[in-house]
């Protein structure tokens, strides 16, 4: 279950101010 969780919440865990990848930003803005 740990593996699935880590793969299911990859951008969710680093979505706050961790804006490191351009993809994360796009996913975040699309979800929010």
From Swiss-Prot:
Residues 1-10, 18-32 form a propeptide. This is MSDIN-like toxin proprotein 2. GO terms for molecular function: toxin activity. Probable toxin that belongs to the MSDIN-like toxin family responsible for a large number of food poisoning cases and deaths. The keyword Transferase does not apply. It comes from Amanita fuligineoides. NCBIfam families: amanitin. The lineage of its organism: Eukaryota, Fungi, Dikarya, Basidiomycota, Agaricomycotina. There is a cross-link at residues 11-17 (Cyclopeptide (His-Pro)). Keywords: Toxin. Belongs to the MSDIN fungal toxin family. Processed by the macrocyclase-peptidase enzyme POPB to yield a toxic cyclic heptapeptide. POPB first removes 10 residues from the N-terminus. Conformational trapping of the remaining peptide forces the enzyme to release this intermediate rather than proceed to macrocyclization. The enzyme rebinds the remaining peptide in a different conformation and catalyzes macrocyclization of the N-terminal 7 residues.
């Amino acid at each position: 279950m740990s593996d699935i969780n880590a793969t299911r919440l990859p951008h969710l865990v680093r979505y706050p101010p961790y804006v490191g990848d351009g993809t994360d930003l796009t996913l975040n803005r699309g979800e929010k």
